[in-house]
Every structure is written in structure tokens, then in C-alpha cells.
Swiss-Prot record:
Domain ATP-cone: 49-139
Keyword Disulfide bond: no
Zinc fingers (unnamed), renumbered ranges: 3-34
Superkingdom of source: Bacteria
InterPro entries noted in UniProt: ATP-cone_dom, NrdR-like_N, RNR_NrdR-like
Protein name: Transcriptional repressor NrdR
MF GO annotations: ATP binding; DNA binding; zinc ion binding
Cofactor: Zn(2+)
Intrachain disulfide bonds: none
GO BP terms in the entry: negative regulation of DNA-templated transcription
Length: 149
């Protein structure tokens, strides 16, 4: 680690603590040359996989698109923002845990439905009707029947 004061490369760690719910490490360092102290924060760089669309095109994972889809599904439903954020975090964690560089958009849609079915059944049906492109009322009935099992 370079000293921000004198650019020396010889620094030592004086103190280390976990911060941000254990997702970061705060370190107090001291420069061996000028003896100035400074703080650094370290965190894991978690890279989301790229999304392979149904047409074969690839694009970066877009958390806002995921959030927007969930917000549309739960609109005017008794689901809190905390519940939504927890569901989104679970989806992102599952995607990272695959260890893959690319995931199919279908997998993301299925993960979204898995979370919605636990949050709110109506929101699940709303999302499924768009995601699965329901053509008529019987498809809604089939989806509702599966929920009631």
C-alpha cells in the first residue's frame, strides 16, 4: 500500500476492524517513512454474471431492471421495501453463487418468480402472466391452480 502523504511503499497495519455488517475491513495504517497514519477500506469485488437474452444477445446484469420488474409486480400490494430488497439480494446472491460468467435470462426470471411466490401470490401471478406471456384466461387458471397445491 502506497502512503498517500509521501508515496512510500512500506506501510504497516496498526488496527483492523470489520465494518458494514462484515462486508468490509477498515484498516488503520502507518507509513514507515513519514509516520503519518491513514485509513483504508477493503471489500470483496463481487462481479455479476452477464445476461444471455433469449435472442442470444448478451448484456451486463442490470439491477435496476430487476428492481423495476419486481416493483411493477408488487405495485399496490402489501409488500414492504425491505422485503423487496431482501428478495433482490437473494436473487443476486444466487446468481453470484453460480460462479458462471454468463447466465440465461430465463434463470433470472425463474429466480424472480421463486421470490415473488413467497412474497405475494398476486404479485407472482402478475409477473408470471407477463414473463410466461399468458395468452388466455385458462393459463391464469393453471397458474393459480399450481399455487393452491
Amino acid at each position: 500500500m502506497h502512503c498517500p502523504f509521501c508515496s512510500a511503499t512500506d506501510t504497516k497495519v496498526i488496527d483492523s476492524r470489520l465494518v458494514a455488517d462484515g462486508h468490509q475491513v477498515r484498516r488503520r495504517r502507518e507509513c514507515a517513512e513519514c509516520h503519518e497514519r491513514f485509513t483504508t477500506f477493503e471489500g470483496a469485488e463481487l462481479v455479476m454474471p452477464r445476461v444471455v437474452k433469449q435472442d442470444g444477445s448478451r448484456q451486463p446484469f442490470d439491477e435496476e431492471k430487476l428492481r423495476g420488474g419486481m416493483l411493477r409486480a408488487v405495485e399496490k400490494r402489501p409488500v414492504s421495501m425491505d422485503q423487496i430488497e431482501q428478495a433482490l439480494t437473494k436473487i443476486k446472491s444466487t446468481l453470484r453463487a453460480t460462479g458462471e460468467r454468463e447466465v440465461k435470462s430465463e434463470m433470472i426470471g425463474n429466480l424472480m418468480m421463486d421470490q415473488l411466490v413467497n412474497l405475494d401470490k398476486v404479485a407472482y401471478i402478475r409477473f408470471a402472466s407477463v414473463y410466461r406471456a399468458f395468452e388466455d384466461v385458462s393459463e391464469f387458471g393453471d397458474a393459480i391452480a399450481k399455487l393452491q397445491k
